[in-house]
Amino acid sequence: MYPEEYNGYLLGGDKAALKQIIDNGVNYATELGMYVIIDWHVLNYAPSRHTQEACDFFAEMASKYSGHDNVIYEICNEPVGADWNSDIKPYAETVIGTIRQFDDHALILVGTNTWSQDVDSVVGNTLDDGNVMYVAHFYAGTHKENIRNKISTALNAGVPVFISECSICDASGNGGIDYASANEWLDFINSNQLSFIAWSLSNKAETSALISSGCSAKSGWSDGDLSETGRWFKSAISGR
């Protein structure tokens, strides 16, 4: 759920229609025995810009889905220009407090500064909640050992890390596939037993889309319906 961008929830979007999309997604995932993330897709700004609005949104979501053990809440996707100690953590404490009024055990994901690259910034100042994980993102064509080092710093300090967005192209979501870097990332993910989510399940004409731009089917995809990126990720998750 974009709060601002693309006719977002807070800036002109049809709130009822957007919440119906979420409800459909939760129901589909539940029927299939899958986890589903309700993501407040903060992008390029500090999450505290909309603290009260985020609380209102997550109060509604958590009250509705508190009986769903498969629902995960991501409360700020990719903050930018937001210090962990002075901005993101206080925001997270407030929003998490709201969610916990309705759901005391759901997993909550908290993004970190610089498009969720600075997961090491939480070391020594984590949140006082037993079911929170801290978010790291990567795009293999752009982000390499420097981001893995940040994740390792967090892991070595006992910080639980969740990769809630990644792909094997560059950070624009486009460009060529960097297979060498992608395989290095996959080795790192597997050796550290990290959960990851690929961006994105769409047929948009860009490298990161998992579905071929010529495919209009919404389910039941064959390997031929997948993009090169989609086929790589299918192979990456097979057998996990």
Pin down the residues of each PLM region:
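Well-ordered alpha-helical segments within folded domains of soluble proteins
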Residues: M1-P3, I37-I38, F162-I163
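N-terminal/domain-start segments enriched in small and hydrophobic, helix-friendly residues
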Residues: I22-R49
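Extracellular glycoside hydrolase catalytic/binding regions
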Residues: L32-Y35, T51-I72, C76-S195, W199-K204, ...
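Active-site-adjacent substrate/metal-binding segments within catalytic domains
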Residues: M1-E31
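Residue-level "edge-of-site" marker
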Residues: Y2, H41-V42, S167, S202
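Short, solvent-exposed loop/turn segments at secondary-structure junctions
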Residues: E5-G8, N44-A46, G81-A82, D170-S172
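Metal-dependent catalytic neighborhoods of phosphoester/phosphodiester hydrolases
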Residues: Y6-L11, P47-E53, S121
